[in-house]
């Protein structure tokens, strides 16, 4: 953890033992250890839930486990690099990142590597890259940079909020062509929430919301499967072996888990009964094997992750690190919304959406991007605490 240590403390400070030790800690320990804990839980549940699918696809029970280890190794190496990148670099290159994301989305459509009727992936050897995940992070970086530069205009002029909305709509069109309706919802709600949080007028955002709803409704109507998803959501038991199959199997998994679960590795629904058991519906398998108490514990850990991310943003804003603060708050919104949609989907609260559960679901691109965003949060917290410590040392010298 040498990255989070600082050499500016070169003389003892008479602040008491507790404060003296805390001044050396330049990262959020709660966030860091919760992140590791969730990744560990995710690895265990993926290892359990992916065995039947691995046998069916590759005749290898460890097929997905091996791939996860590769993804985790790549993610670890990139995390070390990202922790060393100053946040100002992300701000300066946010527009280029967004442009690259758009190019990758277009490339995915051209290559048309279709899986389950969706063209969302760029194949690179045996690895699959999903540009939609990168587009979330790059757009959030761009939005934070825009709000940092145009903070006064956003509060006073309606047209100032139109530019990020237009760019969001362009991304939404590219995502819809894949199609990836879940990512569109994430971008749409996160954008409106952050604009409101940082000064945009509520009446203007309501106008934008209504306008976009009128755009979205025809897109739902022209695709029969989307209408069917909504109808199935109201009562999946009307068609338990057809359109409601995935949701009913998910609910059965929750019911089997009861309070304390069936035990690790003892899930029955993962045996080809529940589709996407190790990806979008991994929380159902977790609830079946660990029970309601295990599921609630994981939800609590995820909630604290989202809360700590918002606290990191608040600290950065307090010392006028506006880009860092807006970025951290945006990432917190993104994580919280995606967690809510995934858990709501598998528990029957929301219509089904193809969104993974952050840090836990199998998915190389989604896991890599969420961990990258988490490393950005740790870097923001590091720079914030470092600035506070430097200011404190200047005060002690006066």
From Swiss-Prot:
PROSITE patterns, A to Z: FTSW_RODA_SPOVE
By its UniProt entry, which InterPro entries does this protein fall under? Cell_cycle_FtsW-rel_CS (IPR018365), FtsW (IPR013437), FtsW/RodA (IPR001182)
One cellular-component annotation, GO: plasma membrane
Q: Which reaction does it catalyse?
A: [GlcNAc-(1->4)-Mur2Ac(oyl-L-Ala-gamma-D-Glu-L-Lys-D-Ala-D-Ala)](n)-di-trans,octa-cis-undecaprenyl diphosphate + beta-D-GlcNAc-(1->4)-Mur2Ac(oyl-L-Ala-gamma-D-Glu-L-Lys-D-Ala-D-Ala)-di-trans,octa-cis-undecaprenyl diphosphate = [GlcNAc-(1->4)-Mur2Ac(oyl-L-Ala-gamma-D-Glu-L-Lys-D-Ala-D-Ala)](n+1)-di-trans,octa-cis-undecaprenyl diphosphate + di-trans,octa-cis-undecaprenyl diphosphate + H(+)
Broad class of where this protein is predominantly found? membrane
Subcellular location per UniProt equals: Cell inner membrane
Could you give a single Gene Ontology term from the biological process aspect? cell wall organization
| A Pfam family of this chain | FTSW_RODA_SPOVE
Q: Which residues lie on this side of the membrane: Cytoplasmic?
A: 1-29, 89-91, 142-154, 201, 314-325, 376-398
Protein's membrane topology: Multi-pass membrane protein
Say what the protein does: Peptidoglycan polymerase that is essential for cell division.
Q: What is this protein called?
A: Probable peptidoglycan glycosyltransferase FtsW
């Amino acid at each position: 953890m040498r990255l989070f240590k600082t050499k500016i403390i070169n003389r003892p400070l008479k602040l008491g033992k507790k404060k003296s030790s805390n001044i050396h800690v330049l990262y959020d320990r709660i966030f860091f250890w919760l992140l590791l804990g969730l990744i560990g839980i995710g690895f265990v549940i993926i290892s359990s839930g992916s065995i039947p699918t691995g046998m069916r696809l590759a005749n290898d029970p460890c097929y997905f486990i091996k791939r996860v280890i590769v993804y985790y190794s790549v993610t670890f190496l990139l995390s070390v690099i990202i922790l060393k990148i100053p946040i100002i670099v992300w701000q300066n290159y946010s527009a280029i990142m967004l442009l690259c994301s758009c190019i990758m989305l277009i490339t995915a459509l051209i290559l048309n590597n279709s899986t389950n009727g969706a063209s969302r992936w760029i194949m690179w050897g045996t690895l699959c890259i999903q540009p939609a995940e990168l587009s979330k992070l790059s757009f959030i970086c761009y939005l934070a940079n825009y709000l940092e530069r145009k903070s006064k205009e956003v509060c006073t002029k309606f047209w100032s909020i139109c530019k990020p909305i237009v760019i969001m709509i362009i991304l939404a069109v590219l995502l819809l062509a894949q199609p990836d309706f879940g990512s569109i919802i994430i971008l749409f709600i996160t954008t409106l929430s952050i604009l409101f949080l940082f000064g945009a007028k509520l009446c203007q955002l309501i106008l934008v919301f209504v306008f976009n709803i009128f755009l979205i409704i025809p897109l739902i109507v022209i695709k029969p499967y989307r209408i069917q998803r909504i109808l199935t959501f109201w009562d999946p038991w009307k068609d338990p072996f057809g359109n409601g199959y995935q949701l009913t199997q998910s609910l059965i998994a929750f019911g089997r888990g009861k309070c304390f679960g069936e035990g690790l590795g003892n899930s029955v629904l993962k045996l080809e009964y529940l589709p996407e058991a190790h990806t979008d519906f991994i929380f159902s398998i977790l609830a079946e094997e660990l029970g309601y108490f295990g599921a609630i514990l994981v939800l609590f850990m995820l909630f604290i992750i989202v809360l700590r991310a918002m606290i990191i943003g608040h600290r950065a804003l307090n010392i006028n690190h506006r880009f860092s603060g807006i970025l951290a708050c945006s990432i917190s919104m993104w994580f919280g919304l995606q967690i809510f949609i995934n858990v709501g989907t598998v528990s029957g609260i929301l219509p089904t959406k193809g969104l993974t559960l952050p840090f836990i679901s199998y998915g190389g691109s989604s896991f890599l991007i969420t961990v990258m965003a988490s490393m950005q949060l740790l870097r923001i917290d590091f720079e914030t605490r470092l600035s506070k410590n430097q200011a404190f040392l200047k005060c002690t010298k006066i």
